[in-house]
Amino acid sequence: MDNLITQLINLFAAVILMLAFAMLSQRRILTLIHLFTLQGLTVVASTVAVAYVTHQHHLYYSAALTLALKCFLIPYLLHRLINRLNVRWDIETLINIPTIMLIGIVLVVFSFNLALPIAKLSASIARGTLGIAIACFLLSFMMMITRAKAVPQVIGFLSMENALFFAATSATYGMPMVVELGIALDVLVGVLILGVFMFQIREQFDSLDISHLEKLKED
Amino acid sequence: MDALLLVFLTPLAGALVLALIGHRAYARDLNVVFSLGTFLAAAALTVRIISDGPLFALDKQFFIDPLNVFLVTLTAFVGLSTSIFSRPYMRVEQDHGKMTPLRMRLYFSMYQLFSFTMLVALMTNNMGILWVAMEAATLTTVLLVSIYRTPASLEAAWKYFILCGVGIAQALFGTILLYMAADRVIGDSADALLWTNLEVVKMQLDPTIMSLAFIFLLLGYGTKVGLVPVHNWLPDAHAEGPTPISAVLSGLLLNVALYAVIRCKVLTDGALHSPFAGNLMIGFGLLSVVAAAFFLSRQKDVKRMFAYSSIEHMGLMTFAFGMGGPIANFAGLLHMTVHSLVKSAIFFAVGHAAQQAGTQIMEDIKGLIKVTPSVGWGLMLGSLAILGMPPFGVFASEFLILTTAMRELPWATPFLLLALGVAFAAIFSRVQEMVFGQTALKPLAHPPALLPVFVHLGLALMLGLYIPPYLDVWYRQAARLIGG
Amino acid sequence: MNLSGLLSQFLAIMAALLLAPLLTGWVNQWRAWLQNRSGPGLLQPYRMLRKLFIKESVVAESASPLFRMAPYVAFGCMLLSCAIIPTLSTDLPLSPAADAIALVGLFAMARVFMALAAMDIGTAFGSLGARREMLIGFLAEPALLSVLFTASLISQSTALTEIVENLAHRDFVLYPSLAFAGIAFCLVSFAENARVPVDNPTTHLELTMIHEALILEYSGRHLALIEWAISLKLFAYSCIGLALFFPWGIAEAQAPVALILAIPAMLFKLAIGGFLLALIETLCAKMRIFRVPEFLATAFLMAVIGMLTHFLLGS
């Protein structure tokens, strides 16, 4: 049974990676939010699976916390945000999507290589997942780089946080509870501040296009 | 222990109170009072440490050792003087209509909250809490950078948020890896991230994981230190935010971030038995010093110019800590202190000067010495101090760093000298034009607060001529703690 | 080679030949129902084949022998590939003839001949269709190969029968790499079988058609063979998919009872698969042809990540 659940965790890891790629190639902002929610759910599911196998009860709490935050509160805030700002446009990427995908593969290879020596050492149940977490981290990073609009950048930022949380649960069975609470608080406050920001940006520029924010350059 | 709690509970209380009444006229004074309270608590704490030695609090989650106690005192002190400086500064901004009552409340409460997060970051024993506090420090300042709501300030704040957010996410990843390494040695307990515990077992931490962890931690916290090439947020945030915030960012936040890097380096060195971490820091430090010096010479905005100077000096400190050894560490710590004091003094003077001129463009600021001699002299002396002129403390620390570099890394010395030379020429020529020359500037409506400027410069001067024995002991103990 | 091997091989070929048009009919019927139409009936493909075989075949004057040969080659390729895919049993005497890589080669050969034949006449539509078909093929083949490689990595063999034997008759293990491969395979199958997101099999709108443009010049028995080959291709792809990702119910060697049970199992799986195909076709809109490279790049990427995941997760 435990063996099966370990495989399940690996499968969740694969799904998270798949969703990271889906987000990378997604043009619609609403779908992007749905994918982000789905990724959050998968992370929660894998956390619960880890908690079940390792009997780490505090992981159930952090799974619940993540569920509330990543699957309900933040998606709700994002939905409200795009409704209020009325931004449902398609996102134009700065590089065309097949190229992004190819770079994505390179990133995955890179992060798998990076994680391989550690995976060999690790005694944790799902040792391969660290590489996937690094890959998701880098993919979200690239998503932030390649999008010129504010909302997708924020989603990229949050999905980066998802990857980190996944790394923490699968590779080390979760951080100490104080730290996790702190991280959750920071993320929540961060999202609120970003929301405030977007209103300010739109007030100033009548647009959420980050390319307006390129005045401050080195002369 | 009471003093320890008081040190960070005072700013937290201040943040709450000022969030409610920050728009009242007396809030400016209240801000000073809270900062003074923090400073007094920090001073009391210092006295305790001198007599009793290192101590813990709250189930070992917080601790004070020779390394962080002097940074706590420094932070509380610069926090106090900046609050004194922001009294007249914010009054002028209010008169200019840049600050609404709501923004004043935001400003004061965030200012206190920012002090709180930095003090927590310095005093926490838990590497995870350190991360949380660093992220919180970004969050509290990001709204302050965009407080004027101008397009440029929004852009700066967005950049600050996104770049530091990404950077700090890398640091979190490094922390997770650190926990993974600790997990294998200490076991899966909530105490596995306590620095004091990690320090004990650092020899047994797995080298592969630790080297990867350190790369992420250095990149992450290095973003907040302002190391090139992840420095882009720094000049913008410094130039577009209110000047008191520029002063605390440069004088304090960068120090705290570097402090986090040093803590991580100690652990990595122990695990790796090789100069890997030090070499990385030397590389990033040297790159920052050289790149910042050249960027610096091309700036037109005075606050941007001094922001680049901060990058240069942080690079120099990173370089020094990277070399390691008692002398370089000593010099790095000394440089940290004097740079904080001098750079915040410069920003105070620059703030007043920019308010007089109504602009931050250096070409439009002329003849300060004729209008307000004290501001002019403050800027001139501060610039000379930051450029490493004897007898200021910066000279002493830079001299120590350079001589160590000549002995240990002879190839790096020409680069350092070149960078310092370029920076000297750039800053000195610009500042000379700003201080002297014909002018059409008008004096300020409210008398500028120049006490902090000259107190800071005086302290920097003192540290250049004479380091008091107890300070010397501190530095030596801290330098030994960093080891390397 | 023994009797039961011969029997299962014979059964596999007969099943493919007879059931392939039925599968096409089933998918079309469901498509009609899902679109609120009454539909042509399940047996329509058989009626059409009969009609086409009776009709006279008209060949253009400028056609070379290649044009006449192509339908037979395509049909032969598809039949051979159906023969080596373990649809009912893994005990196939023909399977050593071709492994997974050769299977992709067989598909490619059929494609090349069809494209050549389309250009042979010299009409504009033929060349256009050929060009588009080759574009899709050249993008889809690496993806399909990577999918098959992922599966062969798990069982350390490129022979389809061994892969299926490994997957079906070992302890149940979740393979994350197969999840990626599965998605990639679905995408490739849509493209290769000219189904909706990539191509519309029922279209005769000149500008959008890909596959139909290739066979515009064919008639009579040639067309019948091509239609049958197309049905066989869909059948082959469905069976590869079922064999790799849902291998339960496929019989092993020397198991006559299992062989008999495998027939209803296969019918059941194909019925569900066909329904899902119709459902997806109804839900999706056909994409612009410029988007197809992106679509297939995604498939390729998924397959490659599947392989990488296999190396990393190592299970």
Regions found by a protein language model. Give the residues of each.
Chain A
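Alpha-helical transmembrane segments of multi-pass membrane proteins predominantly involved
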Residues: M1-D219
